[in-house]
């Protein structure tokens, strides 16, 4: 059984706010990991379905950068949204980076790509 995906963040509060605001994820728990001087937070959709997103913040991390897209080992997260244009409009108002405007993936599916505050690529999916 697939349990969770973990991504790093440079600012825990900002990331929790981002995923809560735009994807309605709710904070399940936060934990201090003393051995690695880190904090982790688990978020999940409001209905408690789907896999969990783990955010990891290392306090002693001096530098936080994303490599060029072609050099990344992790590709992207994906979230289904009810109305892709309305979602992107709200994201634009919050200065979210939109990397690919909406386009038809197939006759029933429209997708777009954005970045979270730390540059993690996120696919938005609208299914009709």
PLM regions: where:
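Core segments of cupin and vicinal oxygen chelate
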Residues: 8-50
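A short, acidic/glycine-rich surface segment
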Residues: 29, 38-39, 61-66, 100
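Short, charged/polar surface micro-motifs in flexible loops or helix N-caps
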Residues: 46-50, 60-62, 84
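Vicinal oxygen chelate
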Residues: 42, 79, 88-128
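Acetyl-CoA-dependent GNAT
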Residues: 57-61, 126-128
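N-terminal beta-strand motif that seeds the catalytic metal site of vicinal oxygen chelate
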Residues: 1-16, 74-79, 128
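Short glycine-enriched loop/turn motifs at secondary-structure junctions
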Residues: 1, 69-74, 105-106
């Amino acid at each position: 059984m697939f349990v969770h995906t973990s991504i790093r963040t440079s600012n825990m509060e900002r990331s929790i706010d981002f995923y809560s605001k735009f994807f309605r994820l709710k904070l399940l728990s936060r934990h201090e990991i003393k051995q690695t001087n880190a904090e982790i937070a688990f978020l999940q959709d409001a209905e408690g379905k789907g896999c969990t997103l783990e955010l990891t913040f290392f306090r002693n991390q001096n530098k936080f950068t994303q490599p060029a897209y072609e050099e990344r080992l992790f590709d992207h997260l994906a979230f289904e949204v009810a109305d892709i244009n309305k979602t992107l409009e709200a994201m634009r108002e919050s200065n979210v980076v939109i990397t690919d405007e909406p386009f038809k993936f197939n006759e029933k599916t429209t997708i777009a790509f954005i970045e979270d505050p730390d540059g993690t690529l996120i696919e938005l999916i609208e299914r009709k």
